[in-house]
Amino acid sequence: MTRLSACLAVLLALAPLALAQSPADTVRAGQYDNGKMWTFDFPPLDYFEETYGLTLDDEWLTTARMGALRIPNCSASFVSPSGLVMTNHHCAREQITAVSRPGENLLDDGFYAQSMSEERPAPEMYAEQLIRIEDVTDEVLAALEATQTDAERADARTTAIDSITARIETAMGDAFTAEVIALYNGGRYSAYTFRRYDDVRLVMAPELQLGYYGGDADNFTYPRYALDMTFFRVYND
């Protein structure tokens, strides 16, 4: 008998014993074990109330949605009525470097505008605010009814989405962008309308050693002793 055959024989002999001694499977999957991120239009309100004792109404959800922002490769939040925006330090490093003047290294040294006139415009920086969510599922699926092949369905879907996007952006004006999002593996399509702010200025950024204190090892560790933040301000022309 070879060594491999001997090992297999031992494993087969021990398998029934291991199964007999194993306790019954007591693991039960929770309702949201696969993730706890939801769209603004379908939050699990009953779950929030039963689990956390938190009762949310439409006004609260609208305030949360209007306070959330999308910036290049990151998210951010409005934190004042005067357009002040807060995000993570790493989300702003490119902009911090871009507004540094000759002889300055604001990424390493930090920046603070003592008045609004000292805030520095960040080139190619923008912020987008989700102002409306529209269910366009019926419109997209209707465009697929006459299709027969996967290629035809893909083309029809793209055409329908482009048409919806163009219609919304034409109706809303230049300050707005639209994006159709496919959800639930194509079971639902939502048209998101964003208010876009292109005049974004740097207000405050700590020096890199404070903003990145602890590095990746400390990320998502609490309490965490770092000034992992940057402040911008958006201006509405």
Label the model's feature ranges.
Residues 1-2:
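N-terminal secretory signal peptides that target proteins for export/translocation
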Residues 5-16:
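Bacterial N-terminal signal peptides
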Residues 19-237:
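Terminal presequence/propeptide segments associated with secretion/organelle targeting
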